[in-house]
Amino acid sequence: MTVHVQLEFTPNPDTLKYTVSRPLLERGAASFDDAAEAAPLSPLAARLLGIQGVTAVMIGRDFVTLTVSDPTVMGDVHAVVLRDLPAWLDGGTEVVTSVWADRDHAGDYDDVAQQVIEILDAQIRPAVARDGGDIVFDRLDEGVVYLRMKGSCAGCPSSLATLKQGIEARLRQTIPEVLEVRAV
């Protein structure tokens, strides 16, 4: 079956989001910003990071988001992705290796942190994934939730508004112990 790739625009002008016609990951997202570090975990991400101008790759369930360092090379990056990504996926390039897939994705969290993670996973992450991004729980410290912005969320002009008006408001409404949300 030939994999089809389609560009979708995101609120972040520095990213390109490509939806693909087959699942890439069963759950979560894989983010990389160094080809050498990505190679043992995601051969696909390593190849994408090898494209001139690509500085970060995030792989989601059925999409890939690329962060591009220089807007003047966006067209070149797009042409390479449209040409090579379907061929790589059809040719069997591994999306993530068993080393990445077997990592422990769950931490040992207290009840409040677990509530935060459940809301993020059920309500927030699916919404930001539609724009090619991801928001990952980092830690909870004295009522402050620290989150990592990935993919098109990283560096997006509207990410602070999303963080404060959307995520912080939702978490504070549901979990009284949450006082603030910050990006790391």
Regions found by a protein language model. Give the residues of each.
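Domain-level signature for proteins that mediate thiol-based redox and metal-cofactor handling
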Residues: 1-184
